[in-house]
Amino acid sequence: MEPSYDHEHPHHLLTNYNSKKYPHVSRTPEYSHSTGSDYPEHGGYLTDGRLMHESNSDAGIYHVRQGSEHSSPSLHSPAIQSSGYENEHLNEAVLAAHSHSHSPMPMVSSAYVGGGTASGSLINSNIPLLGGGGNSVLNKFLSHPHAGMVGGGTGQMEDCTSHSPIEAASMWSYDYKGDLCAPNCGYLERHKPLPADLKYRPGGTQSKSAKESRIRRPMNAFMVWAKIERKKLADENPDLHNADLSKMLGKKWRSLTPQDRRPYVEEAERLRVIHMTEHPNYKYRPRRRKQSKLRAMQPGGKEQSESSPNPGTGGSKSNPKLATPPLATASSSYTTPTDESTCNSTNQNHGQSTPGGLYEQPLKPTYSPSSVDCYSNADSTEQIESLAANCPPALLNESSPTGGGYDNSLLLKKLTKPSPSRAAKSRQEKLAKSEEKNKGSQSQGQSQQGIYAATYPLAPTSVAVVAARGMYVTCNNRGLLDHGHSVKGTFYPPVSVSEDDNSTSMRNSISALQQHCNVVTSTPSSSGGTMPTSEMSSYTVSMADNCGNLRLSMNELSGNEYLPSANAYGMQYEDFLRYQSNDMDYSTSAVEHKETTSDSASGQKCLKYPDTNQNYDDYEAEAYSNAMLPATAASYYTQLPYPPTSLAAFPLQLAVPFQQTTSGAYGAQPIQSGYLHYGNYGGYEGMAQSQPQNQAPVHHQQASHSAPPSLSVPPNQTVTSNSAAISMQQHHHHHFGPAPGMVGVGVGVGVGVGVGEMLFEQQQRKDDEISNILAGVRKTCYSN
């Protein structure tokens, strides 16, 4: 291999471009411009130092890894184990050269190992990256024996060496990674062993594009420190699992004094500044763990099993990420991508044992670009939680690699509760659709599941709502914490208990709702049936009963693409329910009556949602209540604080009501309850409880439901009619809580507030509304 002078090569161009673009990167001219003469001995290296072997295949594999592992590939670029690569050139040369070419970090000067095949030396372009600290880093970096080789024949090497003497030590053996980007080091370390290489090879190509495009966050001080310390700990305790190392590192870091941490803090700041200069428009987007991990890790499934003895919790526990701070979670994968990612994918697989489980997860974009933007600010934990919310419990567990810093079990608990992923839900809902007839009895059990799912994560959950036409609307439900007061209940998507169960229970609950709606007085009996299932279910039932039509919405939900009735934003959910309910056979209401059990299921669904929404602004609740007081949905709409047209304008939470415009507008649907809102959402657990008790007197139930802040409706409002008052109370409740199927809680039989009716609005309206909803959702997602 003659050193070719292809400075013209894209790679070389890249390096030149980098040097121009990032003058701060101090590449030694020898590196980028060294002529073949510099490397004549290294046939493998191009004059620019780029490895001749740098071929697409090589680069592809390498890139994939590189992109995945570290925010600044350049850091890790210095050396990639040649053994892993088929290319003989690769073997000959340190891979660093090509890394910078694809690496997001232009900073990486093309550091080309100058040595012969043996030269594993990393002369590393990272030196500039490291900046002032670079010298020491270089020293460490170059201290590898191979590094010495690098220096051997090339003047360029001397530049690097000038920073520090090059010692013969295998680059790999050295834990320069502490100095270099942690992710890079972790990456190198992981891939250093052949198995790791093998692991990545299969998955590498799959996730290559994703990983390549991914810009890693700059390491924080802990990561910078942990990079170095982890290597030391690993050498001292070779038998320890990465998760244990992470725990030890976390404790050790916490025990460090500010003085001890200062150098790492400074280095982290320096890296951050560099990162900012390189990626001025960089915006942190939490990794779509489920998707990418699933894809990337599946090939390495064997590793997954290894890394996570217990797929659900083991993965998260063991994730070395634990050691790394949440910030590291995105990049921490570098430390144990195998553990965590494999765990994640494994968990996902396990968690989503449901028919579509595996393929479904990737399908449902946990975070659509917009959703990512929505919570790009969320810290890793939040993102993980949101993922968890969307993912099956197992997934959640894996998702919580961040758990390393945090109590994984805690995260898992939080996240696992809404285990059903949206995709799973949609899939299950479809199944439920088919099974729904058979599931009348199941619905109770399902409702129980709903209970487990009921814990509504405070953490943001991104919800992919399948709008009509199979569109995915992804809104990330930011946790209450995230949204704060601004979107109290809207973003909590009603979480259906389980996919199939959810849909089935939804339908059942809907039917139950219809029963109640049709026979408000029958509510007591209905509630009696539901109560056994659970307070939640009874609560839901009463709600559902109140809005018999609601049952339709629920059915629609379960039956329709509407993916996660539970996951959708409350209002989105409502809207979708409404639309789907239109699709549903309205006549089903009679059937719904039969399905008392389903009532309980819906109740559970409602319960799922904690009554986080109770805090919904009272004024809004009152407004809704007042709107509800009017017998007709139309009046409700007119009274809505936000005109129906302003759907897009007001947050999703409110969006539903306007969509419920006049029943007259829908014409086809009675739209008893102007708002399909999730009147008695699970948010009101108290309501759920009281409802069962009060179900006989619907108004009592409703009142109890309204007991939550949404209860703000004045007595005179209740006067309108028990059902009306109840419905309005529930309605405003629903604002607060995203009860999945509960939307039609408003009993408003006389009042005509029946949510179900609204749901029944004609499909055409549904379609129109959906577009509006989508617009509103998008607005909300992006704005948030």
Curated annotation (Swiss-Prot):
A Pfam family annotated for this UniProt entry: HMG_box
Low complexity bias (residue ranges): 409-421
Biased composition (Basic residues): 282-293
Disulfide bond sites: none
Alphabetically ordered keywords of this record: DNA-binding, Nucleus, Transcription, Transcription regulation
One annotated Gene Ontology cellular component of this protein: nucleus
GO BP term, pick one: chaeta development
InterPro entries listed in its UniProt record: HMG_box_dom (IPR009071), HMG_box_dom_sf (IPR036910), SRY-related_HMG-box_TF-like (IPR050140)
Region (Disordered): 278-376, 407-448, 686-719
PROSITE patterns: HMG_BOX_2
Biased composition (Basic and acidic residues): 426-439
Biased composition annotated in UniProt, kind: Polar residues: 306-321, 329-355, 367-376, 688-719
Subcellular location per the Swiss-Prot or TrEMBL entry: Nucleus
DNA-binding region range list: 215-283
Gene Ontology molecular functions: DNA-binding transcription activator activity, RNA polymerase II-specific; RNA polymerase II cis-regulatory region sequence-specific DNA binding
Name this protein carries in UniProt: Putative transcription factor SOX-15
